[in-house]
């Protein structure tokens, strides 16, 4: 295929605006997939994606299409996720494209992620084709979409196309416009063969599989290659493209998107964003990759059965190969044994990674309460980065603790503006500006502590705006706050797995909730157990588990009260002695009960 007949593009949009459905129609119209193999969400290969109806990974596919001008064009489509947690997936997919189809749901209009994704595409200098989707629905409001496009995105309404991903109306016209508007890949004048790895996965039989966009030269089976980041050399076992399954072919040439299988067995050998070059025709410098992505949310993941530690470690290595934003390092806890401290982009990302470990790798795991990275300034002038409450130094040595803030753009119908502002303020946030998107919608810019949006901010926003509110956020630096370490003591012994760093105003509430939950989860012993929540040595909440006791008065019928009192006193002495030497074994279920409790209504 000549370079001028290739078009590389991706579909970007807010969550649920119909990206995967539109991709299904394109596959059907171009005849890429046989009629009998067609099914909804065809590109979403993971069970988890189908169940939740969301896209988690970007999916590449090659289509051939003849618009009627006598040429057959090669269209490389990449379907991308819509959630803010996966915006890194989107930005990587954009690196492999020359153009983007921006979808807008005709019933919802422009939403927060629409704005965020179009900014990513503009930053990559991509040609954008605005498309209004779902025009077959009775609730479609095209005029509102045109207004918002001109107001918020600054795109003239004449550029927009109207399609229905469900019925297929307007999709053929969209394919013609993609060929007309999106430029073909440029031929590079630089020397050396080079391809950019924009994704990868691990195959049990064939090892590492790299998804690449070839920039210069040609890769074929048997080519000797070298990776730029670590200098590892290898030989290509297979090259091919996606149809949507992997299909081997003879060669991958400049401009095309496909996969190559180097002879690498270890997941650690290859990195997403790396450049692959031909050892015999090397490139002088690596291709511009991606910005390193920094995890925002941290959580400990431990195997429920400690013997499975090595298996969990291997599973995480394979998962990290497929999910570049996931990072982990080994750690140990006195209560939970050996495990890993893991970093994620957001709460949904954390949930998905845990679910994938359970399903794809059959791991029984336990996850600790999510936290963020705090900057702890000591009185000695030293700065510590703390993502685990266990490593927080003694309060007397701390000068101040700074927590990460985010700048959030919340898009909501005007009627809910008061509720949304109250929600932001209840999470210790400040609304900095409000701007009108159109007659019925506003964009609220707010600054909030990252920790506050971890648990239920998104859910609450959705429910109070009847599902119409949407948000997108970016980091906004660190600020000092009244953060304290909340310790949970069982029988006077602190349990590290339950420690957390919280704002002083919420410490009592949080401590009380954990204590109540533990009271239900720990079985009664022969002596009384005190469960206490403490901040810096001061107990702020307490629950007591009553002891089990034998009825020592059962054999006394009538008789003097002193006899009964003597027996009761004797029992009391025994219980006191038992308490001194007694150890409380906290069952695994108690950890699960507390750590699974994501409904900490702060």
Region spans (language model):
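Structural and coupling elements of P-loop NTPases
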Residues: 1-602
